[in-house]
Curated annotation (Swiss-Prot):
This is Cytochrome P450 monooxygenase andK. Heme binds at residue 448. Pathway: Secondary metabolite biosynthesis; terpenoid biosynthesis. It comes from Emericella variicolor (Aspergillus stellatus). Keywords: Glycoprotein, Heme, Iron, Metal-binding, Monooxygenase, Oxidoreductase, Signal. Pfam families: Lactamase_B (PF00753), p450 (PF00067).
Length: 865
């Protein structure tokens, strides 16, 4: 034991001496730079300041107390004098970024941290990444993207008009400007919208994911070694998840789709991803991961920063109405000079050089920069002289944009006040000097690549919002900012109405009331959906549409659709249609069908799968489960044609109702052979169940557990009746809704309070349908928002619940990102893709718009007899 004690006794004094000498060294190193005492010993104060969300204010106050140079860490010096800008941020190489920027890199297991133009410390790598794409960000190239910006502006206007323009409904404008900024970057980067504006909310956790990334990276940047320990290693990534992944997933998805040819750029305007891929393909020196790095920068840095500046301009214009009035006057004159007094989006050439608009934007950049921590640099071996002090090699120096932009000798004593006029009345040379002083976009060789995109986007947006609308902030005192490297703004509740002087003609949307926002859980997972035409035609008489016969009606030929849903290698079938040997159904049902006007059925669904020779190679043996939307004969098909390994999934209460099937239960509609010899799963929509989830207005169950496909509780038509909702694309999310018999005919849900009848529908047809309803004993409904066909109680044992279900379906039917498919909608035949082709690209092909009112033509023909 003695040797151990002796060793400890010898080591302990050495350890104490090391710690003591280290502390003395820290006190001595940079000892001529003033600052708080504890900052000389540790970076912990810096980390704590950032965690408060108001580090920018603390930095400003420190410079008021200690002067131009403040030591805020053992090796870190904060500088407040703009005269040092060209020294700290030169145009030459040799002053690299500090380890603060390591924390800004997303980490991918197996690959490591992804360097991008903004965060790379290796100056040679930075040159390799920036050089090939710098020309894409020149204003001459950015101007080519203007049509894509205008397209997104129109979507924003449509949503403002539909949701808020009454002037009485308050909303947080900062959220909507963030949605807009992200949609712009999505459109110009990928030719895709994320869907934030249409939905009025975050999708796939993208926005919250970026903010969460910044909230963790900003404090870690003050002590970068902590980031390596807590986040940037394989073990941490496995336990905590991968940093930056919501954005990386989107970027990877779109790059893969573009490379494989599954997605294309806008046919009129080459998006940035296309240009990135062309550059990488034509230059062997550019690494293969470069397009990912470039697009990641666009999404994560180019969106939040622009949204911050947009919000700053609008908030200050509203709280300083005299500046709003002056800007409106300038824009009105520019609109007159443009020669199009009805235009609500002015072209870039008309607003680019407007002095007061430019002053407002520059003042926003100055008073509220998007990034408000230090832009750190490592002092090179030659050292630096700053503000008369010699800074030794290895020290870290940096300037905070918040502090530099409030330099009183440069910008005046009122630096904390919004005053766009400070940018007016200068010579061109002096104005450029002022613009070069603000640090909002960085300085020197690492100045922000996307500056021109941001300026154009912000000026386009601000000019449009001011020209077209009158804005009122509800309570300016509720406005909040939180600094976690990026700024997050909130509490900016406003009301809006059209300017009385503007003849505003919104884009036709056929909507009279905005449907409730669909709160569908976010997910990055999708399924592939194929609509199967089961090759069955059933002719129906009036009883599906009206209470009693209608003169001239000769019947409708109704198809039956099933759905093949694929999640990777897992395949399920939603409904099976009518079995081919329907004469073998229970006698009561077989007799009913025998007396039907007309029925033809050519094959069972399993045979349709097995006979496919297109190379898809999804056969009956591959089906994991058959899902019955309900137990009626035209949906249950023949499960016995699938192997015993295929389970049967039914809604709540179906098992007890069917009682083992016919002949065991003589009163049921299904056969014993449908049920026997296979696993049967009865879905529970109990809110306490692990897989239960709220999906828009429906109670649902997440079938695959990844948010790609939901079974929805849709009662009314029968016991255990279910619908399905499949997510078929992300960023933006689009869905296919499988309505089952929640509604039998599109005329029973269209038009609706959310979707008015188009003017091009023949009035003669509308009169016929309204008259037919009255003649058959129903109550004729008038107006362009009432369904053309009645909702018959005879078809729905629980009419109250059925009405609730159909109202929910109407909400989904009115949403641009949901394609509602009714299984008996004959107007879809020949109008959409059927098995074996998938229908995931319905949105891109415009199938919802092209088929929405086709049933009217079908009804006109049916009533011509």
């Amino acid at each position: 034991m003695m040797p151990t004690v002796t060793a400890v006794s010898a080591i302990l004094p050495l350890a104490i001496l090391f710690v003591f000498s280290r502390a003395l060294w820290k006190l001595w190193y940079l000892s001529d730079i003033p600052g708080p005492f504890w900052c000389k010993l540790t970076n912990i104060p810096r980390l704590c300041w950032v965690r408060t969300g108001r580090a920018h204010d603390i930095h400003y106050e420190l410079h008021k107390e200690y002067g131009k140079l403040v030591r805020i860490g053992p090796s870190m010096i904060s500088i407040s004098d703009p005269a040092a800008l060209s020294t700290v941020y030169p145009t030459r190489m040799g002053v690299p970024k500090s380890d603060f920027y390591k924390t800004q890199r997303p980490y991918v297991p197996g690959t490591g941290a992804l360097p991008v133009v903004f965060n790379t410390q290796n100056e040679e790598l930075h040159k390799e990444l920036r050089g090939p794409v710098s020309s894409l960000y020149a204003m001459s190239n950015v101007m080519k993207l203007e049509p894509l910006m205008d397209e997104t502006l129109q979507v924003l206007f449509d949503q403002i008009d539909a949701r808020f323009v009454s002037g009485t409904k308050a909303f947080d404008l900062s959220n909507w400007l963030q949605f807009f900024a992200f949609e712009v970057m999505g459109t110009i980067s990928f030719s895709k919208k994320y869907g934030f504006l249409e939905a009025g909310r975050d999708f796939n956790g993208l926005l919250s994911g970026i903010w969460g990334f910044m909230k963790s990276a900003a404090p870690m940047g003050q002590m970068p070694w902590l980031d390596d320990v807590l986040y940037k290693n394989a073990l941490a990534a496995k336990l905590r998840g991968t940093t930056g992944m919501p954005v990386l997933r989107i970027v990877n998805k779109y790059i893969t789709e573009r490379i494989t040819g599954h997605a294309k750029a806008s046919s009129d305007h080459a998006d940035m991803l296309s240009q990135f891929l062309d550059i990488q393909a034509s230059n062997e020196k550019v690494p293969t991961w470069a397009p990912k790095a470039w697009t990641f920068s666009n999404v994560i840095a180019g969106s939040d920063s622009s949204a911050n500046s947009m919000t700053t301009v609008m908030y200050n214009l509203m709280t300083h109405p005299e500046t709003m009035a002056r800007l409106y006057q300038e824009l009105s004159e520019a609109k007159q000079q443009a020669g199009n007094v009805t235009a609500h989006i002015l072209p870039w050439t008309s607003i680019r050089d407007l002095p007061y608009l430019d002053a407002c934007v520059m003042e926003a950049f100055r008073i509220h920069p998007a990034f408000c921590l230090h832009l750190e640099r490592l002092v090179p071996e030659t050292g630096m002289e700053i503000c008369g002090k010699q800074i030794p090699p290895g020290a870290i120096v940096g300037m905070s944009p918040w502090v530099i932009n409030r330099h009183k000798p440069t910008f005046g004593e009122d630096v904390h006040q919004w005053r766009p006029e400070r940018w007016l009345g200068h010579s061109e040379t002096r104005l450029q000097e002022l613009k070069n002083t603000i640090l909002t976009f960085g300085y020197g060789r690492r100045v922000c690549l996307g500056k021109n995109i941001a300026i154009m986007e912000i000026k386009k947006l601000i000019s449009s919002l001011v020209l077209n609308y009158e804005w009122t902030v509800i309570d300016p005192s509720e406005y909040r900012v939180e600094n976690k490297w990026f700024f997050k703004q909130s509490g900016f509740d406003v009301t809006v109405k059209h300017r009385s002087s503007v003849r505003h003609t919104p884009r036709a949307t056929n909507m009279t009331k905005v449907p409730p926002t669909l709160a569908i859980p976010a997910s990055s997972s999708t399924v592939e959906v194929r609509v199967i035409n089961t090759r069955t035609i059933m002719r129906t008489d009036h009883s599906l549409l009206w209470k009693s016969p209608v003169e001239g009606f000769k019947g409708l030929d109704l198809p039956i659709y099933a759905f093949l849903i694929s999640n990777g290698n897992r395949h399920i079938i939603f409904d099976l249609g009518l079995r081919q040997d329907y004469e073998n159904l229970p006698p009561r049902i077989a007799g009913l069908l025998k007396n039907a006007p007309y029925i033809v059925t050519e094959a069972n669904v399993s045979e349709i799968l097995d006979s496919d020779d297109t190379g898809l190679d999804i056969k009956g043996r591959d089906i994991e489960a058959v899902i019955w939307s309900h137990h009626h004969y035209d949906h249950t098909g023949d499960p016995s044609t699938f192997p015993p390994s295929t389970k049967l999934v039914v809604g709540p209460g179906v098992l007890s109702l069917t009682g083992g099937g016919y002949p065991k239960n003589p009163n049921t509609t299904v056969l014993e052979t449908d049920l026997s010899g296979r696993k049967i799963q009865e879905i529970s929509f109990d809110a306490q169940a692990d897989s239960s989830v709220k999906v828009g207005p429906f109670d649902g169950v997440d079938y695959f557990g990844d948010g790609s496909f939901y079974l929805l509780n849709a009662p009314g038509h029968s016991v255990g009746h279910m619908c399905g909702l499949a997510r078929v694309t992300t960023a933006p999310d689009t869905f296919i809704f499988m309505a089952a018999d929640g509604c039998h005919h599109p005329g029973a849900i269209r038009p609706s309070e959310y979707m008015a009848l188009p003017r091009d529908i023949p009035k003669s047809l509308v009169r016929k349908l309204r008259t037919a309803e009255a003649d058959s004993g129903g109550k004729a409904q008038d107006g362009d928002t009432k369904p053309l066909l009645p909702f018959l109680p005879a078809l729905f044992p629980d009419y109250t619940q059925a009405m609730e279900t159909v109202e929910k379906i109407k909400q989904l039917d009115a949403c641009d990102n949901v394609f509602v498919i009714l299984p008996h909608d004959g107007s879809l035949l020949g109008a959409i893709d059927f098995f074996p082709r998938p229908i995931n690209d319905w949105k891109k092909k415009g199938l919802k718009e092209s088929t929405r009112w086709k049933f009217c033509q079908e009804m006109e023909e049916a009533l011509s007899g």
